[in-house]
Amino acid sequence: MKSVESLTEAEAAEELTRLADEIAAHDIRYYREDAPTISDAAYDALRRRNDELEAAFPHLIRENSPSLRIGAARAEQFAPVEHGVPMLSLDNAFSDADALEFDARVKRFLRLDEEVAYTAEPKIDGLSCSIRYENGRLVRAATRGDGRVGEDVTANVRTIGEIPQKLHGQAWPEVIEIRGEVYLGHAEFAALNEAAASAGQKTYANPRNAAAGSLRQIDPKITAQRPLRFFAYAWGFVSAPFAQTQWEALQALKAWGFRTTPQSRCVKGAEGLMEAYREMEAERPHLGFDIDGVVYKVDRLEWQQRLGFVSRAPRWGIARKFPAEQARTVLEAIDIQVGRTGALTPVARLTPVTVGGVVVTNATLHNADEIARLDVRVGDTVVLQRAGDVIPQILRVIPEERPKDSVPYDFPHVCPCPLRTEVVRETTASGAETVVRRCSGEFACPFQRINHLLHFVSRRAFDIEGLGEKQLTAFFERGWIKAPADIFRLHEKRDELLAMERMGETSVGNLLANIEARRTIGLDRFIYGLGIRHIGETTATVMARGYGTAAHFLEAMDKVAARDPEAVEELDALDQIGGAVIEAAAAFFGEDHNRAMVEDLAGQLTILDAEKPKTDTAVAGKTVVFTGALERMTRDEAKAQAERLGAKVSGSVSKKTDIVVAGPGAGSKLKTAAELGIQVLTEDEWLEMVGS
């Protein structure tokens, strides 16, 4: 990566655009989907790079800059709640120097020579929540959302025992928004995951994801079953002042019935900030819940008001982040996992070690090249890190502790499946080798088959509830389900199902009913469910609309496999279809066993024709962007409606955009549309235009 100083303006603009898109995608995964894919440290590095570029090229700051945005927009399944006072985030500090500079900035701004009093509070790693009380009674609760508009989770919050339905005492303001963190302790998290695993359900990667997923359930009864906890630490809108300092406010929150972090303390000056950080870092492993830093706040509220805010964060507070926790352990073995498409992934099996309050027993090694780079071997003592307290990874080997009989790891040349088929290294179209090694056995490989079946029943494919990894593996090992079509013959095994442990009349009946409900399926889901490489959800939808019927699709794929020029040209002409998709489709349908599997499956189903996009509507051929909160339909419904009417839906506004449909909470996209002179419609105007 080039240094900021060496970048041209064009290079900086290009990188800022990429960073904005990348950070926005990670914000959605973290705040809305509760499923982050990178570590906190990696995310912070992206933001720091963005900030450095904007500092060097301030004229390139865009409306959608991550430095001007908080969190992610609310999910459509929750009603919008506008916060009385925005829920802002804090700037981060990563070193003593950063924290000292924060103290110096505060003193410069306030023109003080005296030491400033601060509160130092543990930064809880959970889901931020704002709870509104009127006349002492809980009336509404919302997630952070994008900082201005959050998600209504009132019914779910009412099920959390540590959140009072009525404030204690009497000295509370008439209206107040209490802010805090919903979280799960380590013991509760372990129990929740153990119960989920026993029931064959998906487990959570960490307590933060579990807390967020539990709070954002559609059914409050599910939330009520989760042992969620809550720490209060701040407030938003308040009808009358109730404290003169942050410390006094924390004591008031306790008096009103909330739990506050017992580790919080009041400190003086820069020395106090350093001492509080060191003490909390030492206490961290013993707390029983996750914290990822220390929050410093100017204690005196009058000074907080004077300091005010800059961009998306207050001047009076900062979050001093902990480095990712590390631990030493022994690599006992390297196992090879085989994915749905045959990719071999090495997994390190470790002597159990506690990192960040979680017992870690394995870590991904990614690929053969990574093993070679680390020169990691069985028996090595390694330094392990739960990166961002999310994904365990091996940082390095401690060579001086390596056993004398150690030998370099030899990546397998045959698949670990019973067939022992050859492993081949993937190459690009130009012939260059990639890091991926694949089993050449395809569906003959049982490991690929079980992962293919898991993809087939997944939510975005056939969405068969009750068929998780545990159940599918058990049915596969018994020989009942070897291919997708076998799922629809499972009713023939009803007696055998009832004889299985934990499979009573109700659970068997529900499972078979769920399977029957998926005998009728849309062509797009059918195509996606086949699990063909490079054919994801969007591509499957494009292909379904392009071919219209299952018969046309299957006939065309046979011809593509035979390299029929007209069939290949027809596929290539579809929007977003390129060479990788054509090659993958040809390879898949060129295998007799794949073709037999597809025909067997199609014989069990009623595959609905895809609805052809219309060409004679007011929006046919136009590019539409939906932004803000939609009140009469979900975002997915709006997208599907627009595409049925022949429009193309985009996630960003550009010169190619024809229409922007803006609801409450529309932000930078609306401003960009105005600057570019793009037609802007309300939701009602859009529905009137399309005749709905």
Swiss-Prot record:
Known EC number: 6.5.1.2
Alphabetic keyword roster: DNA damage, DNA repair, DNA replication, Ligase, Magnesium, Manganese, Metal-binding, NAD, Zinc
GO molecular function terms noted in the UniProt entry: DNA ligase (NAD+) activity; metal ion binding
BRCT domain location: 614-692
GO terms (BP aspect): DNA repair; DNA replication
Family matches, as InterPro entries: BRCT_dom (IPR001357), BRCT_dom_sf (IPR036420), DisA/LigA_HHH (IPR041663), DNA_ligase (IPR001679), DNA_ligase_AS (IPR018239), DNA_ligase_CS (IPR033136), DNAligase_adenylation (IPR013839), DNAligase_N (IPR013840)
Residues that bind Zn(2+): C415, C417, C439, C445
Cofactor(s) it depends on: Mg(2+); Mn(2+)
Active site (record annotation): K123 (n6-amp-lysine intermediate)
Enzyme class: ligase
Domain of life: Bacteria
Residue sites binding NAD(+) per the record: D40, A41, A42, Y43, D44, S89, L90, E121, R144, E181, K297, K321
One annotated Gene Ontology cellular component of this protein: cytosol
Disulfide bonds: none
Catalytic activity as recorded in UniProt: NAD(+) + (deoxyribonucleotide)n-3'-hydroxyl + 5'-phospho-(deoxyribonucleotide)m = (deoxyribonucleotide)n+m + AMP + beta-nicotinamide D-nucleotide
NCBIfam families: dnlj (TIGR00575), PRK07956.1 (NF005932)
Family membership: Belongs to the NAD-dependent DNA ligase family. LigA subfamily.
Role this protein plays: DNA ligase that catalyzes the formation of phosphodiester linkages between 5'-phosphoryl and 3'-hydroxyl groups in double-stranded DNA using NAD as a coenzyme and as the energy source for the reaction. It is essential for DNA replication and repair of damaged DNA.
PANTHER family: CHROMOSOME TRANSMISSION FIDELITY FACTOR 18, DNA LIGASE
Protein name, UniProt field: DNA ligase
Source species of the chain: Phenylobacterium zucineum (strain HLK1)
